Amino acid sequence: METFNFSVPQDITVGKGSLSKLPEIAKKLGGKHALIISGPHLEKMGLVKKAADYLASVDIKADTFTDIEANPSVTTVEKATAKYLESGADFIVAFGGGSPMDVAKAVGVVAKYGGSVTDYEGAHKVPGPIVPLIAIPTTAGTGSEVTAFSVITDHSRNYKLTVFSYEILPKYAILDAELITTAPASVAAACGIDAFIHAEEAYVSTAASPFSDALAEKAMAHIGKNIRRFVANRNDIEAAEAMMTGSLFAGIAFSFARLGNVHAMSHPVSAFFDVPHGVANAVLLPVIAEYNALADHGKYLTIYNDISPIPAYADEFEPMMLVDAIRELCTDIGIPENLTIAINNASKTGTVTKEEIESKIEPMAVDAMKSGNIAVNPRASRQCDIEMLYRRAL
């Protein structure tokens, strides 16, 4: 066994109705004034006000910032940072899906150390602790409440930059399954499959360890056996709890084992065409699972048995059975059949032709190759391989 290390330095509260613990946790943090960073959907539903009211119950003031898009931009981080500084807040509550989480982490850095989020792009460029952060996810998907990553879109480059630093891990996380029951089916599907891919890619990563494998296996079992049920009925609290727990385990797993070609390739798709992150991942997954099958050394069987209604045994299993099972799962939960459909579904300017998409394949592949996730994908990949995979996904 190779040497590996791990540290999970966060305080995580899990349980139905645990949003009510926010005042207690904020007091523990020592905060007097919060900026709640969330999204417009939660604001309309009254959940942002509910969080603010919880804080007010212990005399903690709360301002809000909810102007956040699906793939948050450098400009959004600048606006949210300005709101934080103007408000006089001394801690942040990240309340929502992956987008508010990413923005909150970036604001925590820039508000503390100045400059632009682009100054912290890459690994370990955050000089020290950031503004204290409480993370409250409302989707079972990103795992961002337990990861050391913030992903922000730089439209000047059509590029999704990543800030990677253990300094940006939220100090506290609250996982309340009641909060994810409000998600539309399409969001539940995209976020749920994203969480599954976090676990799957961490599991087959060349950087995987016994620790990350244990978490990834548990995550895949929780998500794979409940995602169809949860997408069908978001009020199924038992399925919601399983999805949220699975997302948590997957987030910790990939924090240590990294990801792979799916995430490396999906970020450029979102940057160039504004496809939601989870959808881009899901469309690419079967194509890359087929590509990686050559490198499988037994883990595909475990993954298959987590998502297939009919279990298989080692003596009858073929890796392509997993690829077929992934396609079946994606179809069942309403994921677009291919990248062309996903891009057109996301388009705000009319039809995007296959030729237009193909013209972006080379620059997307160039950007994908910049991702550190390529290096831990189980099958080695060159730029020409990435271009080929994009074409297969069309």
Range-by-range predicted roles:
Residues 202-328:
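Active-site segments that bind and position negatively charged phosphate/pyrophosphate groups
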Residues 112-208, 299-302, 306:
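A glycine/threonine-rich phosphate-anchoring loop and its flanking beta-alpha core
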Residues 43-115, 229-240:
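N-terminal small/polar loop signature for handling phosphorylated ligands or for N-terminal nucleophile
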Residues 19-22, 44-47, 74-75, 99-105, ...:
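Short glycine/serine/threonine-rich phosphate/pyrophosphate-binding segments
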Residues 20-35, 54-58, 86:
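Glycine-rich phosphate/diphosphate-binding loops that line cofactor/substrate pockets in enzymes
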Residues 1-29:
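N-terminal amphipathic/basic leader segments beginning at the initiator methionine
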Residues 310-394:
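C-terminal charged capping/lid subdomain of soluble metabolic enzymes
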